[in-house]
Amino acid sequence: IMTRDKFFETIDKKVGLENREQIEWAYALAKQFHREQMRDEGVRYFEHCRDVALVLIKYGPTNPDELIVGLLHDIYEDQFVPRGMIKQLFGNEVNEALKTLSHEKPFYKRHGKIVKTSESKKEYFDLIRQSSVLVRRVKLADRLHNVLTLEFCKPEKRIRKIKETREYVLPIARETDMRFFKAIKNRCDYWDRKDHGK
């Protein structure tokens, strides 16, 4: 079982101590903001956030900002985050990366009101494809972890996710990092054989 201590031992060994405090903040924030969410496989949603950071380490080299974005990649989409908080804690690059990765973007109105707007799937993935390597790598780590854990979701959701992955994510992976491309494609092929006998 991956505990907090083991996670940070891995960080110290593979990434070093640079910005360690900020990574700890991101870890705590992800745990707090996602505390009531569960995944299809019956585990805390936070486990997915932590696993995305571990995938980024495995497919390194990585850096503190990338790990922070990995830990917090769903924070704007799933939660209502106070205006300016992420930018204040982690800087503008991390904040903008998190907004790009969110399918539902926060729009801050007066008196603390937050409205969420979303774009089409194609617009969303086009934006990611044109973004920084950091944004693309976090999306690829997120999707790789998702396709590795698809046995716990309903077949129709799985088939939809694999189709979306082939259409939108694999082209990004091919342009970004062939290791991600091969790992994600292998898992898509596995599920196609399982679900369609291909």
Regions found by a protein language model. Name each.
Residues 1-198:
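Active-site helical microenvironments for divalent-metal-assisted chemistry
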